Amino acid sequence: MANAASGMAVHDDCKLKFLELKAKRTYRFIIYKIEEKQKEVVVEKLGEPTESYEDFTAGLPADECRYAVYDFDFMTKENHQKSRIFFIAWSPDTARVRSKMIYASSKDRFKRELDGIQVELQATDPTEMGLDVFRSRAGGIEC
């Protein structure tokens, strides 16, 4: 088990599932949560490759923080298909202050455990992580 700087442990499954997403494209997305009592980051939800962006956003609670990884497919201006792995720090305004602080203090260390993140987004509401934001940050147009 890896250890985040805030004293948060990172469950081995977090890294294993990320490697499967990155290398084998087994998942479209992964949502992670911090189990405060166990002081550990764990996998909360795995999105199948066929699941959509809407399925992903529906998995993020409106009033609780989460970390997420999303494998975003897009077309470049030269008409080449590409993908980018996004790391999303979801911290809605309505989340508890303590939760926001725990997620913020653990984020960088947790992100370092996931080798291969290409783009990072921080969002406090859904408009900050819309498909248009993903497209512009990835440098292409959506597939």
From Swiss-Prot:
It comes from the Eukaryota. Coiled coil: none annotated. Keywords: Actin-binding. InterPro entries: ADF-H (IPR002108), ADF-H/Gelsolin-like_dom_sf (IPR029006), ADF/Cofilin (IPR017904). Residues 5-139 form the ADF-H domain. GO terms for molecular function: actin binding. SMART domains: ADF. GO terms for biological process: actin filament depolymerization. This is Actin-depolymerizing factor 2.
